[in-house]
Regions:
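Residues that define the transmembrane beta-barrel architecture of outer-membrane proteins
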Residues: 8-14, 61-65, 107-111, 141-143, ...
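Residues on the lipid-exposed face of transmembrane beta-strands in outer-membrane beta-barrel proteins
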Residues: 14-20, 67-73, 113-119, 147-151, ...
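Surface-exposed extracellular loop regions of Gram-negative outer-membrane beta-barrel proteins
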Residues: 39, 91, 102, 137-142, ...
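Outer membrane beta-barrel strand-and-loop segments of large Gram-negative receptors
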Residues: 58-70, 106, 110-114, 188, ...
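Gram-negative outer-membrane beta-barrel transporters
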Residues: 120-127, 218-220, 241-325
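Conserved C-terminal beta-signal and adjacent last beta-strands/turns
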Residues: 163, 271-272, 277, 290-370, ...
């Protein structure tokens, strides 16, 4: 399937960080702020109904600002207290291809405060407890607690944890009417925020020559946000639109699964490892799989490092396998693998340190069909 334009993305980020070390060892206060502007463009390579070859059309214009202030206080050798404040601002401009439902600029902010305490109760038992309060401009107040318990015995670690979650709909999901490659996605101002309860059990064994780890988890979600196909209108068909979707809430959903992995260090400088991940995501309201979920996936990595006098050579190979991705809207996306190789070269000169890096991403040049790359 050929298209009349290419997608192009550009972004810039500006920000700064300040850190103040306190007299008590390992205690400090840190603040940072950053602003990111993200833009997408359609660069036309063929003449179309409304544009000529060479036209540049702004398709997305979004701004994020994030500021936070956190304090880490070592109150005792067995106790560390974390506190903080967060501010997040999101702004979304209407564009030619991503109009707003009311055709107006939209923005939203979220303020949050949190406290978390890490306590070592006994030589083998540690507890982490925390709570976060968030105030969202549109969805008001929300408290989310977390709790974890870890048992350590020699080289064995066992951790059980629980965390509540809260995620507001994005401005794109609430207000935008976006058109891309014959598809329209419509926001819904009436969306509710997602809420979740996450449970996890993790076991790790760390030896000098190898490590193994396994975990099982379950995430119960309420009002999960997902886009569904709502069918095209006669006007859509007349304008060449083949699919129309709208964001909605799923009343009940659940994601559960497990992963198991290992890493081996047979000799100095060399390491390799792999892991397998199984994920089962279900829309419990309709008793079907969650959109765009992948049941089977895995990762492989290997690296080698060697130093000769003032030169150090690093090489790393990383591979990722993704099984069939299920989609009611698009049909299943086929399983695939992606492989990267990277090298880093460190030169430790008398007064200058140089570290050039060379690598290749997607070594085997895997590409997906356009219908499986859309959100």
């Amino acid at each position: 399937l050929a298209y009349d334009y290419n997608n192009r993305h550009q972004s810039y980020t500006v920000g700064g960080t300040a850190k103040y070390l306190l007299a008590k060892r390992a205690s400090y206060i840190e603040g940072n702020i950053s602003t990111t502007n993200f833009r997408s463009f359609y660069d036309y390579i063929n003449d179309a109904k409304t544009h000529k070859t060479g036209d540049e059309v702004l398709s997305k214009d979004q701004t994020y600002t994030n500021a936070n202030l956190k304090g880490v206080f070592k109150t005792h050798k067995n106790n560390t207290l974390f506190t903080g404040l967060d501010y997040v601002f999101e702004g979304l401009e209407p564009t030619e291809t991503s109009k707003m439902l009311n055709n107006e600029y939209q923005s939203v902010y979220t303020l949050a405060a949190y406290v978390q305490d890490e306590v070592k109760l006994l030589d083998a038992i540690s507890v982490v407890a925390g709570i976060r309060y968030a105030y969202n401009e549109k969805f008001k107040s929300q408290f989310t607690p977390k709790l974890s318990l870890m048992y350590q015995y020699s080289e064995l670690n066992v951790r059980a944890s629980y965390a509540a979650g809260f995620r507001s709909p994005t401005l794109q999901q609430m207000y935008a009417v976006s058109e891309s490659r014959g598809q329209i996605t419509v926001g819904d101002p009436g969306l509710d925020p997602e809420k979740s309860n996450f449970y996890n059990l993790n076991i790790e064994y760390n030896h000098r020559l190898f490590s193994i780890a396994a975990s099982i988890y379950q995430n119960d979600l309420k009002d999960k946000i997902e886009a569904e196909d709502i069918g095209t209108t006669p006007e859509d068909i007349e304008n060449g639109i083949t699919r129309r979707r709208q964001y909605r809430n799923i009343e009940k959903a659940r994601v559960k699964g497990f992963d198991i992995g290992f890493s081996v260090r047979p000799f100095t400088g060399f390491m390799f490892g792999a892991n397998y991940i199984y994920t089962d995501g279900r829309n419990r309201t309709e008793d079907i799989r969650l959109e765009r979920t992948v049941r089977h996936s895995g990762n492989f990595n290997a690296s080698w490092r060697k130093t000769w006098n003032d030169y150090t050579f690093n090489i790393a190979i990383n591979g990722r396998y993704q099984g069939t991705r299920w989609s009611k809207t698009y049909g299943n996306a086929p399983a695939h693998q992606l492989w990267d190789i990277n090298t880093r070269h460190s030169f430790n000169l008398k007064s200058v340190a140089l570290e050039p890096a060379v690598g290749v991403e997607n070594i085997f040049n895997y590409t997906r069909s356009e219908e499986h790359t859309s959100e």
